[in-house]
């Protein structure tokens, strides 16, 4: 028996919008007898769809919606977990025998509120890292500023850069980096954000190729010191979260490939769990592929070695659970690390539940899995319409061939008459690739007229529903 909690980053660290759909990826981790806690009642069609793939029966799960807090049913309010009546409800749903049988409390985000919830149930020892997370260790482990210090201590290669605590320091760091930068560009990073949403690329050359970069925002610097000073006068509040967090200023590495190695940190040790590749289009995360291919053995070894050293450094702090070490493969073959996501990343369900659990990518013939974000050019009217199109095109996942599309999360419109926004996985033969299948779906759904969406947006116009 496990308790699975579909939360997201604490709003006290970073405000989020409507996370109902993204947090329902929790269903992919569910096993018989598990109790799931979500911010709302799950989408019934998606529950049936996901469980049909995992083989878990709906009646084998208990699903509870946490009390609506400050964000209604759009986001799980951390404070809701500790409401005494809800704790009693969880205890009653488990039953006296099952409370003692709980083997793990598992949360998408390692919140101090989860530690308090586990303690209220008498299950603090079943939430790995509870003591660390109870003292806001989740914020410590997920800061890009803290990452640079920990990576330096672990001897893991990172790009030239600096952690800045004020505007004057940021101006000085930007000037120094640009003076010695081969690319003539730097990346500004918020301490707390994900999927490139909190990154801004500062360039002097307006013709520089940046489409592939994980940086939602782009700024062309005016010439000279005045251009740098003007930028920070305008953007320091955004970059620092109104002065709450330090800011990372880092050299930009052009023509680099984005990869990652994921690890699990336990009380005893750490172990590698998967490697993969991230691909950006229009500076937004477009898709990711597992397992990682197309790299040399020295690159793979460097990725795993650096990831393992980072995982051990975070474990030594007190972190427990899954974590992802993001890196860049530079054109000369060097691997440099850029951040650690010390949480259940947006990759875990792809490789653990879908690629290995359903597709079995390690079996013969070989398979890979790519997960796509719905592009901003697509207009998908509903979950049912997408599934119907998959059936019509013969693209739904086929267990016999171990190829086809599996929708990874419910498709919930964020506003009336808006297209639904979601992610979907595609299992494919590496010899054939995934572009052909994607192109067939693109031909069906790419109906959004040019000029009506912002290409730098994560998934189109309007509120962003998900990102790691």
Regions found by a protein language model. Name each.
Residues 121-197:
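A conserved helix-loop-beta module that forms one wall/lid of the active-site cleft
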Residues 181-187, 192, 203-204, 213-279, ...:
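Phosphate-binding site of ATP-dependent enzymes
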Residues 359-468:
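Peripheral (often C-terminal) accessory segments that flank ATP-dependent C-N-forming ligase machineries
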């Amino acid at each position: 028996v496990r308790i699975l909690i579909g939360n997201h980053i604490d709003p006290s660290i970073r405000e989020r919008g409507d996370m109902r759909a993204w947090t329902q990826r929790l269903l992919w981790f569910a096993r018989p007898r598990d109790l799931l806690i979500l911010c709302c009642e799950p989408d019934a069609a998606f529950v049936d769809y996901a469980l049909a793939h995992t083989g878990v029966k709906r009646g084998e799960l208990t699903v509870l919606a946490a009390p609506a807090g400050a964000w209604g049913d759009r986001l799980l309010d951390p404070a809701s977990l500790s409401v005494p009546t809800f704790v009693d409800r969880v205890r009653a749903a488990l039953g006296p025998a099952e409370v003692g049988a709980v083997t793990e409390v598992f949360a998408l985000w390692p919140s101090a509120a989860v530690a308090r919830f586990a303690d209220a149930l008498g299950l603090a020892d079943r939430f790995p890292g509870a003591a660390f997370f109870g003292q806001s260790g989740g914020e410590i482990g997920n800061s890009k500023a803290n990452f640079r210090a920990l990576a330096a201590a672990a001897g893991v290669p990172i790009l030239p850069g600096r952690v800045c605590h004020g505007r004057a320091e940021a101006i000085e760091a930007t000037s120094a980096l640009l003076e010695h930068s081969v690319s003539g560009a730097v990346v500004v990073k918020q301490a707390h954000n994900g999927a490139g949403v909190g990154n801004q690329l500062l360039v002097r050359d307006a013709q520089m190729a940046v489409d592939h970069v994980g940086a939602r925002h782009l700024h062309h610097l005016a010439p000279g010191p005045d251009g740098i000073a003007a930028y920070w006068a305008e953007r320091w509040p955004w970059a620092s979260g109104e002065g709450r967090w330090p800011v990372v200023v880092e050299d930009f590495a052009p023509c680099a490939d984005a990869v990652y190695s994921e690890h699990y940190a336990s009380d005893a040790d750490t172990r590698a769990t998967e490697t993969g590749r991230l691909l950006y289009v229009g500076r937004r995360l477009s898709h990711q592929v597992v397992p990682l291919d197309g790299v040399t053995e020295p690159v793979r070894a460097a990725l795993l070695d650096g990831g393992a050293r980072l995982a051990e450094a975070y474990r030594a702090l007190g972190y427990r659970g899954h974590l992802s070490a993001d890196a860049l493969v530079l054109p000369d073959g060097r691997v440099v690390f850029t951040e650690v996501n010390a949480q259940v990343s947006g990759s875990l369900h792809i490789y653990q539940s879908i690629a290995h659990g359903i597709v079995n990518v390690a079996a013969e013939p070989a398979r890979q899995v790519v997960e796509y974000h719905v592009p901003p050019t697509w207009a998908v009217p509903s979950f049912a319409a997408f599934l119907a199109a998959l059936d019509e095109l013969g693209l739904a996942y086929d267990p016999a061939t171990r190829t086809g599309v599996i929708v990874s999360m419910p498709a919930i419109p964020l506003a009336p008459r808006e297209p639904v926004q979601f992610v979907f996985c595609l299992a494919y033969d590496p010899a054939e690739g995934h572009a052909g299948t994607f192109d067939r779906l693109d031909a069906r759904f790419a109906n959004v007229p040019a000029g009506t969406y912002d290409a730098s947006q994560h998934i189109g116009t309007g509120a962003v529903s998900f990102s790691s």
